[in-house]
Amino acid sequence: MKEAIARSGADPALMNYVVVGNCVPTESRSPYVSRVASIQAGLPMSSVALTINRLCGSALQAVVSSSQNILLGDSDYGIGGGVEVMSRGGYLSQAMRNGARMGDTKLIDMMVAVLTDPFGVGHMGITAENLATKHNLSREDQDAFALESQNRAAKAIAEGQFKDQIVPITISTRKGDVTFDTDEHPRATTMEALAKMKPAFKKDGSVTAGNASGINDAASFLVLAEAGVAAKNGQKPLARVAGYAVAGVPNEVMGEGPIPATKIALERAGLKLDQIDVIESNEAFAAQALSVTKVLGFDPAKVNVNGGAIALGHPVGATGAIIATKCIHELHRTGKRYGLATMCIGGGQGIAVVFERL
């Protein structure tokens, strides 16, 4: 957040509304994450902050919510994004507060809970299996998609495409300082290696760890402003929010959420699909992403050109801002005009945002 503010060139004192997406509780300050992050990023005590949970769509919703705050006149500047530390996801004891009178008790893995359908379908991987069946997607289709995601991400990293998007973080260890400046999740693989992986969620299924997104940690933020105020203060925006939408779908095929959300967002933006130059479609699972591409008729050459979540990871509450950042940077790299960021949401929703490069 601090780096996003610095890059914007705006005065932190003017950042008066922060919206942060977060899903998995990790510590005692988790309920305060938006407020703590904003104050530690240098915002004044007079600023306000809001933590939201729209599951996988949380950070993209935070961008939308910040835009809405500006449109409503609640703020001139806003910050939208998200954070997720899945590696530290907490365990919940429902019995400890009032005492377990006798017998065994259990702990609930709140990280896995976020990845589990709330209506009894099971792990989100089962919803991907449902889509593979519905849209006739073979194991080979999914593995080929996963391999392409890995290859595109590896190429983008080698070419330094993410250098301007990632803020290096240095931590001290017993062996000295370690700097993280490159995504850890991508890994070289082959169709043969992917074919050897066992189904992860269903006996004789086709969804594996190799063609699904990972368990990851990240934070990502965008600074938003009212156009007139930004111009008056000498800031040149990278893009504008041209349209957005959230839509509901049956929970057992929650991965189809981007389909209606994208249609509505494009309509609100006054655009047709063929006018979209860059598409960031979150890869929760290969079966899910392939289904969205198939139904909407996306041109695969425009989708996740620098790799997607299967390769780069899916830190649930942060991913939306990450793909928005990727989308906007790719628009500037290529000189294209319109971009789309869209993703499915557990429980049966989808979100989509259209950006125009400025």
Regions found by a protein language model. Give the residues of each.
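Active-site-proximal alpha-helical scaffold in enzymes
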Residues: 52-84, 132-161, 222-228, 315-336, ...
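Conserved catalytic cysteine-centered active-site region
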Residues: 18, 22-77, 118-124, 188-214, ...
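Conserved active-site "lid/cap" helical segment
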Residues: 1-23, 27-37, 41, 56, ...
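Condensing-enzyme catalytic core mediating Claisen C-C bond formation in acyl metabolism
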Residues: 191-192, 196-256, 260, 264, ...
